């Protein structure tokens, strides 16, 4: 039976071949021959290659123009025209051999030259040596690190804290530790560069809202809510984060935290709060923007800050609930893969915290001086003050731009030089122009510390006024 069936199939095939149109047979034959040619033919023929003559080679070499190793840089670039500082950047700073009152360094509480902080750092140096020579997970954890984390958690009234060896890497590591590809981050358009790098590393979907504009943020949250309703399955695994600064580095303004907390609960998002500028500045005890507004620390999912401003040390920290902080010990790249904070800097930060707790009146003094300089800088012809009266870092921008960023920077730099010649050390706010997501206008940054006297504040304001008249008018 099987042989009969095979013969019948063969007969059908032959019959179909006879009945097929001629053009169909020709086309199939051509395709078969083409396939055979492709299988057995070489990709190229050696005899078809033609070598260039010596003359043609020389012509190609002469025509070739290599790309520059580095992009062209103006001779006026600040990196090529730097100031040389002799000694520590304390209240009085020596710049290019001239002593000035320091209005440029973020030494808000004046702890950089504090004898107690120096003594604590020196004692730690004698006990532990200079560095740890390893990350926290590889014999880089010293008892002083654990003491500092415990003190920070207690000071901020959170369950746990984690320290990083570099302030910039703190928030830049914390964001990608939680927010991943597919998650959505709503971030203020004035966010600092460290936040921007953290968002870039997270590969999340970034949605910018207008600076401190709660209505614009809610608009974006509503739009996302509508999108989530279209695809509930995807929405269930998509996390939503709101990333803001307590006191913005680029604008000197305080975030509207109470309204943000309301939106957090309404739209089921998480809040990451960067407090590098507000920690040790805002609040009755210097705990930052949460204390300033009287908001429970439990309403914020993660708080980060560096220790290079108010604490006059190096590094940064994150604090919050234990399960949130513990995750960073496994996923925070700046924590896992960087050498841990030198013990002497951890000891210095602990002593700085001791001083802050023993002398809470220092924050009221700083606030008063911030308000003083903010008022004194008003009404300078050609300049506008950007920042709130609570901010120890204010920006002076041109009232009217020349139309060229390079010329604006040059005018402001002439003012900085004029002030330096008069004994007032200022600096321009520096940005990586091509890297910034929303590049702020050029500005002179004025930094207030508790060490500056009222006479020095008035002198700085009058010197800036004179510089504006000399350069801008």
UniProtKB/Swiss-Prot annotation:
The enzyme's E.C. designation? 2.3.1.50
The PTM entry states: Phosphorylation at Tyr-164 inhibits activity and promotes cell survival.
State the family it belongs to: Belongs to the class-II pyridoxal-phosphate-dependent aminotransferase family.
Pull the Cytoplasmic topological domain ranges from the record: 37-473
Task: State the function annotated in the UniProt record.
Answer: Component of the serine palmitoyltransferase multisubunit enzyme (SPT) that catalyzes the initial and rate-limiting step in sphingolipid biosynthesis by condensing L-serine and activated acyl-CoA (most commonly palmitoyl-CoA) to form long-chain bases. The SPT complex is also composed of SPTLC2 or SPTLC3 and SPTSSA or SPTSSB. Within this complex, the heterodimer with SPTLC2 or SPTLC3 forms the catalytic core. The composition of the serine palmitoyltransferase (SPT) complex determines the substrate preference.
* Protein name according to UniProt: Serine palmitoyltransferase 1
Cited Gene3D superfamilies: Aspartate Aminotransferase, domain 1 (3.90.1150.10), Type I PLP-dependent aspartate aminotransferase-like (Major domain) (3.40.640.10)
Please give the residue ranges the record annotates as the region Interaction with SPTLC2: 1-66
Q: Which organism is it from?
A: Cricetulus griseus (Chinese hamster)
Q: Which reaction does it catalyse?
A: L-serine + hexadecanoyl-CoA + H(+) = 3-oxosphinganine + CO2 + CoA; octadecanoyl-CoA + L-serine + H(+) = 3-oxoeicosasphinganine + CO2 + CoA; tetradecanoyl-CoA + L-serine + H(+) = 3-oxohexadecasphinganine + CO2 + CoA; dodecanoyl-CoA + L-serine + H(+) = 3-oxotetradecasphinganine + CO2 + CoA
Q: Does the keyword Membrane apply?
A: yes
Q: Which UniProt keywords apply?
A: Acyltransferase, Endoplasmic reticulum, Lipid metabolism, Membrane, Phosphoprotein, Pyridoxal phosphate, Sphingolipid metabolism, Transferase, Transmembrane, Transmembrane helix
The record describes its membrane topology as:
Single-pass membrane protein
Residues on the membrane's Lumenal side span: 1-15
Quaternary structure per UniProt? Component of the serine palmitoyltransferase (SPT) complex, which is also composed of SPTLC2 or SPTLC3 and SPTSSA or SPTSSB. The heterodimer with SPTLC2 or SPTLC3 forms the catalytic core of the enzyme, while SPTSSA or SPTSSB subunits determine substrate specificity. SPT also interacts with ORMDL proteins, especially ORMDL3, which negatively regulate SPT activity in the presence of ceramides. Forms dimers of heterodimers with SPTLC2. Interacts with RTN4.
Which domain of life does the UniProt lineage start with? Eukaryota
Q: By what means is the activity of this protein regulated?
A: SPT complex catalytic activity is negatively regulated by ORMDL proteins, including ORMDL3, in the presence of ceramides. This mechanism allows to maintain ceramide levels at sufficient concentrations for the production of complex sphingolipids, but which prevents the accumulation of ceramides to levels that trigger apoptosis.
